[in-house]
């Protein structure tokens, strides 16, 4: 007779059986899935023993090819073979048009403004293409591990915004994966090295992949990984090295820059092969059609020097943001296949003054770290206790206040998950609604920040301006996704929004936001101070005008009223200009001139309230 398996509600009948979870590195050029096996995190191979899955999908009549077969067909069937789809995740048609010369696809628009790639199977969104890659990785993992997955940790660049992160989660869901967490790629690398080497101190994670670059500064102490600062470039990677070589071939071979898709693809494959060969060789033979030439490592390094310099500039900025000095960085971890380029390792080593760590395969380190985190989140306790992991948000989050100013609620580099609240109030008497405008960025004026969402809080009880208390709460979950709620504390009316990312963001915006915030810090501070003085002046003018309309004839002599109106006109004239100090002084002057009027109004109000009441009634 079979024995019944009895367990507490919610507990597995086999409490010591491991729950199957994986880490997935969904890369621009290559992807990989890893899992903990026999206490060690390792990549999972396919039936042929390959652990790397090229991030390539080819659409044919009635079937798909994913991986190496698709990549091999890219030259012969470029319109139906999608490579580097990660660059399109969460992007809009405007961004695709900027990349049009580099991407040999036919793009069509959709209602969501998401770009669709026209294939023989019909339009395919970047989310669908990524889902096809993730599905192959899921099937590989389940076949290797011998069971159904409870979930996966999927890595994304630290610089991925809401739209790109949400697109990644959508792709996973479409592939039949339960996302335990989205994990920043540099943080995943820190997890891998922290486990294997028990590192402590300040560590820089230099992650140069096929399409994106990330730099993270982390402090590692006793199992705690805290990201101090992040930076990078969403449009910098090994693909750009390939395009540099391809441009050189076009120039040397005397080719037209207006190439058909098949020639473009073949040219990029030739360039990629030359780049990889120059990792070990000083010179490589290059051929394209009837043209033959030689490319030296020195010439290649000269081509990519501006790209390497861009990455180093981002490194310096991240170190500055972290509050540490370059000399305090005790280790530099290299992540991504593009860090195999000798010039990259040399430049990074020179910047930080130490030889970068490369003991874990840079193509595998992210997946290995993600698998460790997935195993923990799946409920499998690790020896030595739990791993505490702290990510940060890359750009400040806030909302619009009067005068078009950006009020930061959650500053950039704040550890997530996080919830922060601030209280705001109404601007006008009797105001019954408030528009909440959610923004992202580092600048002081909303015109220089990115608009994320808008929603309206209605039903605010009628009160004088400034009496209502509206608490606005920003909440960022562990995946870096944002929700915002607003509540009027007196009445309890509330409204909220789950920020639905727009797919219309262009590639350079995030990097430009940070760059502009540094370059315009001084002028932004001046602009904010000016606008604050203008808002204060406008509010005082409105309040004084309301008081004059209500009680001016009753409580003021004609000379007193003329004096107040003269100061009001002086302030109006100054508000049309840009002299913040003068506006501030005139606002104070008008306030002083109206002090006696305000006192009379208060006395009048008190007398009216006490009229007809005796002392006993007042004391009660």
Swiss-Prot record:
Q: What Gene Ontology molecular function terms does this protein carry?
A: ATP binding; ATP hydrolysis activity; ATP-dependent protein folding chaperone; unfolded protein binding
Superkingdom: Bacteria
Q: Name one GO biological process term.
A: iron-sulfur cluster assembly
Which PROSITE patterns does the annotation name?
HSP70_1, HSP70_2, HSP70_3
User: Which UniProt keyword terms apply here?
Assistant: ATP-binding, Chaperone, Nucleotide-binding
Q: Which Pfam families match?
A: HSP70
Q: What does this protein do?
A: Chaperone involved in the maturation of iron-sulfur cluster-containing proteins. Has a low intrinsic ATPase activity which is markedly stimulated by HscB.
Q: Which family does it belong to?
A: Belongs to the heat shock protein 70 family.
The name this protein carries in UniProt is Chaperone protein HscA homolog
The organism is Pseudomonas putida (strain ATCC 47054 / DSM 6125 / CFBP 8728 / NCIMB 11950 / KT2440)
